[in-house]
Amino acid sequence: MSRIGKNPVPVPDKVTVSLDGLTVKVKGPKGELERTLPDGVSVSQDNNCIVVAPSTSKRFSRERHGLCRTLVANMIEGVNNGYSKSLEIVGVGSRAQVKGKTLVVSAGYSHPVEMEPPEGITFKVENNTKVIVSGIDKELVGNEAAKVRAIRPPEPYKGKGIKYEGERIMRKAGKSGKK
């Protein structure tokens, strides 16, 4: 049995959860999320807790047990507190700004790169070099942050590019040259 999956998910007072078969709807102060869980698990509500259990003892059911529990926990955390990911832009002349809702990144290309956020995601820029991606869906926040980083991933020689806050870049030595 999954060590993560067997723990019940506590539901805060400000959050309401409704179950319809394998569809879980979570509503909280930050918004509302809905997700259909894969087959092989059963979801039930006891008091102020959500319990996820494998519906059969087959392997695919046991594999999805911990995953589904974590997905439900992430939904509850997202509508209650939200998620955010910070990125740093390193390099001379590289900067970002928000125009309306669109993120505009100047990262050393001949043109600025524009990113339109999907529904539920907001971009915020501090000091022209720090981008904060925030929203209530953890998966969507992570995907959008990865797309921003992919505009100009950090290079190993000088460390220039877009990196996650706190990310350590493995540095390489340059050519030593002829003597």
Curated annotation (Swiss-Prot):
* Alphabetized UniProt keyword annotations: Ribonucleoprotein, Ribosomal protein, RNA-binding, rRNA-binding
Q: Does this entry carry the keyword Ribosomal protein?
A: yes
* Xref: Pfam families: Ribosomal_L6
The record's section on InterPro entries has: Ribosomal_uL6-like, Ribosomal_uL6-like_a/b-dom_sf, Ribosomal_uL6_a/b-dom, Ribosomal_uL6_bac-type, Ribosomal_uL6_CS
GO molecular function terms noted in the UniProt entry: rRNA binding; structural constituent of ribosome
Q: Which PROSITE patterns match?
A: RIBOSOMAL_L6_1 (PS00525)
Domain of life according to the entry? Bacteria
Q: Which GO terms describe its biological process?
A: cytoplasmic translation
Give yes or no: UniProt keyword RNA-binding. Answer: yes
- Gene3D superfamilies reported for this sequence: Ribosomal protein L6, alpha-beta domain
A GO cellular component annotation in the UniProt record: cytosolic large ribosomal subunit
Give the NCBIfam families listed for this entry: L6_bact
The family database entries (PANTHER family) matched by this protein are listed as: 60S/50S RIBOSOMAL PROTEIN L6/L9, LARGE RIBOSOMAL SUBUNIT PROTEIN UL6M
Give the record's family classification.
Answer: Belongs to the universal ribosomal protein uL6 family.
Q: What does this protein do?
A: This protein binds to the 23S rRNA, and is important in its secondary structure. It is located near the subunit interface in the base of the L7/L12 stalk, and near the tRNA binding site of the peptidyltransferase center.
Q: How does it assemble?
A: Part of the 50S ribosomal subunit.
Q: What name does the UniProt record give this protein?
A: Large ribosomal subunit protein uL6
> What is the organism field in this record?
Parasynechococcus marenigrum (strain WH8102)
Lineage summary: Bacteria, Bacillati, Cyanobacteriota, Cyanophyceae, Synechococcales
